[in-house]
């Protein structure tokens, strides 16, 4: 599906929980398509100038410096905006001319209009869970993207990933995945973020280095998820029940 979107110059939105593999997926697709990848981590202070570029003062005057979005447009790269809803709406709106038939990037400060080079593609990602409780994309922006839904892989596949990436044996990997699935069931009980595959891999790497399994789970999985004493207690109980 992603390859077809790229071939037809369609912008893509990757939707899924934190740590489920969205960034790894886009890195793989850029490699598979043979395109350079420009990654931008979005945040509240990200401005249009941070994306497009700005004039810099030099000893002999001023010089224009392209931002990462402009470089991607010129080079025909895949431009990946990670967690796009963290950016302000007045920043996101500069993407609109690149997501329709025009495929252009107007640069007001220089008066230049850049036509996207062959191979350019705009890709954004966001977490539709916790982020929608705080902020969301405008409908006028959402409808410019083809949406691909992501989720955590099935248990056996996730265990294989944890074993490979974390370096633990399959039995420990299955235990970590089982713990992760139990903890994900706490989302409706006040847990804002569920444990990602990334957290399970972090715990696996600690275990590989010789850290006891329960302690590795506490510091790599339980503590990053919550500061609420009651939730921490419930999660620690699940760890103890999983690795008896």
Regions found by a protein language model. Name each.
Residues 8, 121, 154, 159-160, ...:
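Alpha-helical lid/collar subdomain of P-loop NTPases
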Residues 1-174, 178, 240-244:
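AAA+ P-loop NTPase catalytic core and its hallmark functional loops
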């Amino acid at each position: 599906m992603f390859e077809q979107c790229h071939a037809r110059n369609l912008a893509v939105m990757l939707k899924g929980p934190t740590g489920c593999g969205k960034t790894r997926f886009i890195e793989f697709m850029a490699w598979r398509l043979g395109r350079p990848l420009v990654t931008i981590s979005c945040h509240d202070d990200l401005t249009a100038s941070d994306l497009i570029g700005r004039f810099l003062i030099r000893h002999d005057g001023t010089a224009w410096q392209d931002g990462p979005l402009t470089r991607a447009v010129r080079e025909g790269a895949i431009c990946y905006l990670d967690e796009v809803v963290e950016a302000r709406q007045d920043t996101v709106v500069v993407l609109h001319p690149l997501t329709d038939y025009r495929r252009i990037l107007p640069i007001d400060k220089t008066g230049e209009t850049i036509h996207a080079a062959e191979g350019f593609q705009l890709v954004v990602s966001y977490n539709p869970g916790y982020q929608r409780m705080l902020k969301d994309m405008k409908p006028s922006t959402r409808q410019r993207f083809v949406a691909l839904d992501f989720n955590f892989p099935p248990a056996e596949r996730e265990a294989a990933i944890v074993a490979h990436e974390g370096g633990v044996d399959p039995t420990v990997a299955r235990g970590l995945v089982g713990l992760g699935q139990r903890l994900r069931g706490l989302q409706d009980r006040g847990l804002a973020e569920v444990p990602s595959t990334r957290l399970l891999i972090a715990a696996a790497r600690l275990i590989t280095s010789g850290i006891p399994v329960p302690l590795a789970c506490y510091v790599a999985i339980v503590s990053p998820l919550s500061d609420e004493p009651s939730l921490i207690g419930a999660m620690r109980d699940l760890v103890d029940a999983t690795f008896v």
